[in-house]
């Protein structure tokens, strides 16, 4: 849930059991607007403007990862035990940093990117980044795994856990098998 207290956003992550109407736990994140919420490993991950906030299954704040002044551009929580975050150095521009973070708030990998990123997706052990002219697939430590050139007709990428990626454009979609 979201609210406001003394002019600042406040988010509360409220946990329910599927067979109960009442919450069994909650965690307040003062001064934070949560954009997305999902599971990373065995913890909930709240994606916010300032960083990632990890909450254990008992509703307690367990760890966090600060963007250190970076601007959130994209985030994918579908990695196997990690979140992939694309950060801009500024609100506009193409100087970007790709980071993978585990549920303890520790960086697994960090990589400076320069170029127009159209889409990003994580699944399993891999992170796919679609640039205007190429697709690059990295492992969760951000070591390059595969590259595909000439993808100008694609506008979106969906990484799959088996290491393949689906490229989608306005007229067609295709699967890249590295």
Regions found by a protein language model. Name each.
Residues 1-8, 36-54, 79-92, 120-131, ...:
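Short beta-strand elements that form the blades of beta-propeller/WD-repeat-like
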């Amino acid at each position: 849930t979201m609210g406001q207290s003394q002019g600042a956003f406040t988010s509360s992550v409220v946990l329910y059991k599927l067979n109960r109407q009442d919450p069994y736990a909650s965690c307040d994140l003062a001064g934070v607007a949560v954009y997305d919420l999902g599971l990373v490993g065995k913890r909930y991950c709240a994606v916010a403007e300032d960083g990632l906030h990890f909450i254990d299954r008992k509703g307690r704040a367990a760890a966090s990862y600060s963007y250190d002044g970076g601007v959130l551009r994209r985030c994918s929580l579908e990695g196997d035990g990690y979140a992939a975050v694309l950060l801009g150095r500024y609100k506009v521009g193409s100087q970007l940093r790709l980071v993978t973070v585990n549920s303890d708030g520790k960086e697994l990998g960090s990589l400076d990117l320069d170029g127009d990123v159209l889409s990003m997706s994580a699944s399993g052990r891999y992170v796919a980044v679609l640039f205007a002219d190429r697709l690059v697939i990295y492992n969760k430590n951000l070591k390059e795994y595969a590259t595909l050139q000439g993808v100008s007709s694609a506008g979106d990428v969906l990484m799959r856990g088996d290491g393949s990626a689906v490229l989608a454009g306005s007229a067609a979609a295709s699967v890249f098998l590295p």
